[in-house]
Amino acid sequence: MTEPLLIPCPHCNGLNRIPAARVGEHPKCGRCKNEVLLSKPFDLKQIDYTNQIKGDLPLLLDVWAQWCGPCKSFAPVFEQAASELVGKCRLAKLDSEANQQLAGPLGIRSIPSLILFKNGREVARQSGAFPLPQLKAWLRSHGISA
């Protein structure tokens, strides 16, 4: 029998133990009763950061800014990826302007920047906007079935 996955709620930051076999069944948070695995990216804030990157499912973070043209053109690609990767990888967005206290320590040098976290650690980073097939290939190269 496989161990349940520990997945932080994107709404209240509460930790949830979800049986791996039930990941595709739209599990709800035990604390706030909202869906834990979203088919769209969620907004990451400083207060949530440490807890959110530690979940058992990988977290792909898109660091962006309102004024950034490539960020805006990449947003629909990231949204589509979120809908296709439910249960495989969680996708979050970090507005680098509104969250400078977090973007700074992450060492963001250009945007958009993607940072992939597994088990609380950064495992990969990629800058720039690219099409969905290239994003999925990049994720597969880091062990995520996309």
List PLM regions with ranges.
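Short linker/helix segments within small regulatory modules
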Residues: I18-P27
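Conserved redox-active cysteine motifs that mediate thiol-disulfide chemistry
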Residues: V63-V77
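Short cysteine-rich clusters marking metal-coordination/redox-active sites
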Residues: C9-C12, C29-C32
